[in-house]
Every structure is written in structure tokens, then in C-alpha cells.
């Protein structure tokens, strides 16, 4: 597992634009850029070692909507690890994205509905599969967070511990886009109980959150941040240097 977490800028795509939602509500969005490729370039220039892309329309529609934009970003930064989630429901989509140059594909809703699909994807694309677990009050949510299930996030994580999943992206829906601080307790608990490295997401606001997560580098391999770096309450480069111990 990773001893030094990496800061991972989020680029959420909606209608061809770079946006941020509040608690996953599509109607409650803030547009930060009309040019997602330029936004990716900005974060790379500021020191990003990895990017987190989300096809929001894809997550709600169940099919990829932003293929061209995603391909353009991957082409612009061929050596940069890029992960993507949203609308990944079949093997063909995974293959197309990996062929386009993406490093990791995040399976969310499909992982809940069909765990065997995750195992198959891990066999077919070993080392490239991440499971996205979105939760509200510890319970898994699916379909772009529109549906809260009766499955515990920790229970879902345990199902994938031995099938070859690279890591878990854990998002606390209640905090996502709200700038209320990261849920350290649930994030660390998921990593310890699930047995897989976790990428923390949702609620990261400023350096205080980075400081709270740093001690858990043995189980948290990345920290996704969106609104905080877009609104300037967190400096990406400064945060990464802090995690690096510099």
C-alpha cells in the first residue's frame, strides 16, 4: 500500500463543461470551466500526479456521454495516471477507455448490481479496475447517488478484497461539494475493514483535512479534491508537498 497519498484533482464533466455538484444533485451545479482539457492542464501544471474524471451525465444515463473530452484529456497527458468513473456498465466501455489511454476505470453502480462483473473486469483488465463506493450515512448509493441501498459500504468493500481490485474510491455523499471537511473516521474504517487501499473523496476543504488524513498513508493512497482547489481554499501543490514531507 502507498505510504504517501497523492492529491487527485477532480474534473467532473456535465454537458461538456467542468462543474462541481453539491451532494450529487445535478440541478445544483457550479460551472468552473467550459474547457475541461485546459482545466486538466492547469492542475498538471500545479503539480497533479493523477487526475480523477467523472462523466456525470454518464453516471445518470448509464452510458458514456463524454468520450471525446475524456479521450482529449488522455491524449494531452499520455504519461499521467488518469482514473474515470460514470457510465461504466459493460466490458466494451472499459476496453475503449483503456485503449484511449486511461489508467484506471472506476466501477460504481454496476459493482453493486453485479459483483461478478467486477471480478470479470479484474481478470480481463488486471491492475486497471477501481471500485467506486458512494455512501450516505454509511449506506451505499447508486445511479449517480439517486438511490440509497440497504448495503453497508464496508460490506461491499469486503466483497472485492480478493478479486484483484486496485483500490476503492470512497465518497461521502453528504459532504461532497459541501466544504464541510472529510469524513476521516468512515474513510479509514472502510480501508481497514475492507482490506483494500482507499482513495478518499468528499468534503476535502483545506489543509486541515490533508493533515488529518496524512497519518493514514498506509491505507489511504489518494485524496480527491474538487471544490476546494477550484475555489482556492486548498493549494494543490502545497498540499502535495506537505504529504511528501517537504
UniProtKB/Swiss-Prot annotation:
Record field: catalytic activity: 1-(5-phospho-beta-D-ribosyl)-5-[(5-phospho-beta-D-ribosylamino)methylideneamino]imidazole-4-carboxamide = 5-[(5-phospho-1-deoxy-D-ribulos-1-ylimino)methylamino]-1-(5-phospho-beta-D-ribosyl)imidazole-4-carboxamide
Keywords: Amino-acid biosynthesis, Cytoplasm, Histidine biosynthesis, Isomerase
InterPro entries per the UniProt record, alphabetical: Aldolase_TIM, His_biosynth, HisA_bact_arch, Isoase_HisA-like, Isoase_HisA-like_bact, RibuloseP-bd_barrel
Pfam family, one: His_biosynth
Gene3D superfamilies the record matches: Aldolase class I
Single GO molecular function: 1-(5-phosphoribosyl)-5-[(5-phosphoribosylamino)methylideneamino]imidazole-4-carboxamide isomerase activity
One GO cellular component term: cytoplasm
CDD domains from the UniProt entry: HisA
Residues annotated as catalytic: 12, 134
EC number of the protein: 5.3.1.16
Keyword Isomerase: yes
Major subcellular location class: cytoplasm
Superkingdom of the organism of origin: Bacteria
SUPFAM superfamilies assigned to the protein according to its UniProt record, in alphabetical order: Ribulose-phoshate binding barrel
GO biological process: L-histidine biosynthetic process; L-tryptophan biosynthetic process
Subcellular location: Cytoplasm
The protein's annotated pathway: Amino-acid biosynthesis; L-histidine biosynthesis; L-histidine from 5-phospho-alpha-D-ribose 1-diphosphate: step 4/9
Family of this protein: Belongs to the HisA/HisF family.
HAMAP family documented for this protein: HisA (MF_01014)
Name of the molecule in the record: 1-(5-phosphoribosyl)-5-[(5-phosphoribosylamino)methylideneamino] imidazole-4-carboxamide isomerase
Amino acid at each position: 500500500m502507498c505510504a504517501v497519498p497523492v492529491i487527485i484533482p477532480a474534473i467532473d464533466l456535465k454537458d461538456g463543461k467542468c462543474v462541481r455538484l453539491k451532494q450529487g444533485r445535478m440541478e445544483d451545479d457550479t460551472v468552473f470551466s467550459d474547457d475541461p482539457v485546459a482545466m486538466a492542464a492547469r492542475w498538471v501544471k500545479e503539480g497533479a500526479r493523477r487526475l480523477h474524471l467523472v462523466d456525470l451525465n454518464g453516471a445518470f444515463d448509464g452510458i458514456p456521454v463524454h468520450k471525446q473530452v475524456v479521450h482529449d484529456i488522455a491524449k494531452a497527458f499520455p504519461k499521467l495516471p488518469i482514473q474515470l468513473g460514470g457510465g461504466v456498465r459493460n466490458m466494451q466501455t472499459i476496453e475503449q477507455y483503456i485503449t484511449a489511454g486511461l489508467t484506471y476505470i472506476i466501477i460504481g453502480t454496476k459493482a453493486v448490481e453485479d459483483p461478478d462483473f467486477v471480478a470479470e473486469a479484474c481478470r480481463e483488465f488486471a491492475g486497471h479496475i477501481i471500485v467506486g463506493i458512494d455512501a450516505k450515512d454509511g449506506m451505499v448509493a447508486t445511479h449517480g447517488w439517486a438511490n440509497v441501498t440497504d448495503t453497508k459500504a464496508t460490506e461491499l468493500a469486503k466483497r472485492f478484497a480478493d478479486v484483484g481490485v486496485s483500490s476503492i474510491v470512497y465518497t461521502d455523499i453528504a459532504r461532497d461539494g459541501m466544504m464541510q471537511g472529510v469524513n476521516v473516521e468512515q474513510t479509514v474504517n472502510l480501508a481497514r475493514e475492507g482490506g483494500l487501499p482507499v482513495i478518499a473523496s468528499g468534503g476535502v476543504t483545506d489543509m486541515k483535512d490533508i493533515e488529518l488524513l496524512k497519518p493514514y498513508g498506509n491505507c489511504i493512497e489518494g485524496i480527491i479534491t474538487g471544490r476546494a482547489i477550484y475555489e482556492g481554499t486548498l493549494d494543490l501543490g502545497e498540499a502535495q508537498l506537505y504529504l511528501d514531507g517537504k
